[in-house]
């Protein structure tokens, strides 16, 4: 089974914020496969499960708020006995320009509180799909920035990148990670 986690904060107030780009992306990917999410209280998340191209897949959106995402991840990972190489986390990254996508396995959390939470519970040896949200301008507070909405042009750029990830997601299901990495650049 493949586990795909989209990071974000629950609630309508956060729905289109920069920090919720993981939720936005995972919903777009799930929609591509005509899946919908349902709440699973025992996992502290919203979940969509399917078999796609003979591959079991589980998409989750933790409902624990960003800083506690690891609690949801460990519950699902343990329940389904999923290995690290089959765990993919989609998240915002302020160190990448808006709309830029990078894929990597393992590494530092870069100060991202959702990744810190996951790392503290399961370690850092999982896959990451990083979506650039850019850095704040004019010494703007980072916390305020990540919780702000995109401008219309920024949102359009980010959605084009997310569509690129969704359109190439089948490569992950086929275990073609190098090809996926090259296609999403």
Swiss-Prot record:
Superkingdom, taxonomy of origin: Bacteria
Molecular-function annotations in GO: peptidyl-tRNA hydrolase activity; tRNA binding
Annotated Pfam families: Pept_tRNA_hydro
Residues engaged in binding tRNA: 14, 65, 67, 113
CDD domains: PTH
Site positions for Discriminates between blocked and unblocked aminoacyl-tRNA: 9
Active site: 19 (proton acceptor)
Keyword terms of this UniProt record: Cytoplasm, Hydrolase, RNA-binding, tRNA-binding
Reaction it catalyzes: an N-acyl-L-alpha-aminoacyl-tRNA + H2O = an N-acyl-L-amino acid + a tRNA + H(+)
GO cellular component: cytoplasm
Cellular compartments annotated: Cytoplasm
InterPro entries hit by this protein: Pept_tRNA_hydro (IPR001328), Pept_tRNA_hydro_CS (IPR018171), Pept_tRNA_hydro_sf (IPR036416)
A Gene Ontology BP annotation from the UniProt entry: protein quality control for misfolded or incompletely synthesized proteins
Site (Stabilizes the basic form of H active site to accept a proton): 92
EC number: 3.1.1.29
Subunit text: Monomer.
Free-text function comment from the UniProt entry: Hydrolyzes ribosome-free peptidyl-tRNAs (with 1 or more amino acids incorporated), which drop off the ribosome during protein synthesis, or as a result of ribosome stalling.
NCBIfam families, alphabetized: pth
Family (UniProt): Belongs to the PTH family.
Protein name: Peptidyl-tRNA hydrolase
Gene: pth
């Amino acid at each position: 089974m493949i586990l795909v986690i989209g990071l974000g904060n629950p609630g309508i107030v956060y729905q289109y914020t920069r920090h919720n780009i993981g939720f936005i992306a995972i919903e777009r990917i799930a929609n591509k496969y005509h899946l919908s999410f349902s709440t699973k209280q025992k996992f502290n998340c919203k979940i969509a499960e399917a078999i796609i191209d003979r591959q079991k897949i589980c998409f989750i959106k933790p409902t624990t708020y960003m800083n506690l995402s690891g609690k949801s991840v460990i519950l699902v990972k343990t329940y389904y006995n999923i290995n690290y190489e089959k765990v993919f986390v989609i998240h915002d990254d302020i160190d990448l320009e808006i709309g830029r996508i990078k894929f990597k396995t393992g590494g530092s959390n870069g100060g991202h509180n959702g990744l810190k939470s996951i790392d503290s519970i399961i370690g850092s040896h999982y896959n990451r799909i990083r979506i650039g949200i850019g850095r704040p301008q004019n010494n703007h507070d980072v916390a305020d920035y990540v919780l702000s909405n995109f401008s219309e042009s920024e949102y359009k750029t980010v959605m084009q990148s997310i569509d690129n990830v969704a359109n190439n997601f089948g490569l992950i299901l086929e275990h073609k990670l190098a090809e996926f990495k090259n296609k999403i650049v």
